[in-house]
């Protein structure tokens, strides 16, 4: 495994660890998710370029589309929660409350 792949896997692991450890605020969770998606995008792009697999060349672009949709939904949820509750604490979000 080359140094580039190890750095990308380290970035993904650090983002995943940040998501698991610092999940008290919704904004920090969204930033960690974006870091994970960026690492997945770079890993998919490098894998496709190195293997010369031209049939899967659209896969990183599709991944970016889903990442943009995820970011838009996450930010709209952040705005809705901060307007409703005044904070962005994840502990305040309970689906069992009316």
Curated annotation (Swiss-Prot):
UniProt superkingdom: Eukaryota
Catalytic activity: a ubiquinone + NADH + 5 H(+)(in) = a ubiquinol + NAD(+) + 4 H(+)(out)
GO MF annotations in UniProt: NADH dehydrogenase (ubiquinone) activity
Major subcellular site: mitochondrion
Transmembrane segments: 1-21, 29-49, 61-81
GO cellular component entries: mitochondrial inner membrane; respiratory chain complex I
A GO BP annotation: ATP synthesis coupled electron transport
The keyword Translocase appears for this protein: yes
Membrane topology: Multi-pass membrane protein
Function text: Core subunit of the mitochondrial membrane respiratory chain NADH dehydrogenase (Complex I) which catalyzes electron transfer from NADH through the respiratory chain, using ubiquinone as an electron acceptor. Part of the enzyme membrane arm which is embedded in the lipid bilayer and involved in proton translocation.
Record note on quaternary structure: Core subunit of respiratory chain NADH dehydrogenase (Complex I) which is composed of 45 different subunits.
Family (UniProt): Belongs to the complex I subunit 4L family.
Name of this protein: NADH-ubiquinone oxidoreductase chain 4L
Organism in which the protein naturally occurs: Elaphodus cephalophus
Gene name, Swiss-Prot/TrEMBL: MT-ND4L
